[in-house]
Amino acid sequence: MSNSRLLWSSMTVTAALMLSACSQPADETTDTNANAPAAETTGKTIRIATEGAYPPFNYTNADGSLAGFDIDVANALCDQMQAKCEIVAQDWDGIIPGLLAQKYDAVIAGMSITAERQEKVDFSEPYFANTMVWLTNTDGGFDPMAIKDATLGGQRSTTPGAYLQDNYEGKEGNTVQLYDNYDNAYLDLKSGRSDAVLAEKVSAKSWLAENAAGFGIVGDEIDNDDNIAIAVRKGDSLKADFDKALSEIRSNGELARLEQMNFGQ
């Protein structure tokens, strides 16, 4: 849904500083601040938007609280940066416009890096890599290798949605139906109003966990270099702060733990 690198150039130090550094014993030159949070984020409140309707990445509990992998990642990053997370729900179509309007500081919502989005926002390093799958009624005869005269569902403004439009809309008698969220796409699949839904694998597996009877994933996974990252406004220094914090929670095993907890992988 839900791939650039910043190359930082180092300043040349003065000869005096070089001599001073060389005069110290090796055990005194260890960088004790390597894991320290950026001064700009310590004690800061960072407002983060998520969708709240894309399990297991993000969803809304019965009591209105937000949960899921994205929320766990956001909290882990804020802990690493010694900042306070304030996470708010925002509908998907308005999530980038809300960021640009400064309603919040970042988007952590299973958002894929795309060229179109990169024209509007900056992305952190990826924190998850996705593949897409076909989800269908197993008794319906849907064949992903020969899709014809089918109604195909997905979510608008997402990587699977764009893939459906680019590859199937108006071709071989196929119709693409895009929805505001995947909940509605899955409802139409369950009611028989669509033949298949193209979704990210983890989202499809999450839905199948409660709707396995008569439904399943068919065909091969579609790997289209779908990397999920954090969106911030163009030129915002938060990108570097998030990149540093992501590197830390990846190296200390916290990111892998959150993946296992939310996805079982």
Question: Could you say what each language-model-derived stretch is?
Answer:
Residues 30-110:
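Extracytoplasmic small-molecule ligand-binding "clamshell" domains
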Residues 23-26:
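Bacterial signal peptide processing site
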Residues 75, 79, 84-147, 215-222:
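Acidic, polar ligand-binding/catalytic clefts
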Residues 94, 111-119, 165, 190-191, ...:
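A ligand-binding cleft/hinge motif common to bilobed small-molecule-binding domains
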Residues 18-21:
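C-terminal motif of bacterial Sec signal peptides marking the signal peptidase cleavage site
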Residues 52, 128-136, 183, 205, ...:
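Periplasmic-binding protein-like
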Residues 46-50, 144-160:
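Short loop->beta-strand "edge-of-pocket" segments that line small-molecule binding or catalytic clefts
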Residues 60, 74-82, 160-179, 208-212, ...:
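Ligand-binding cleft/hinge of the Venus flytrap
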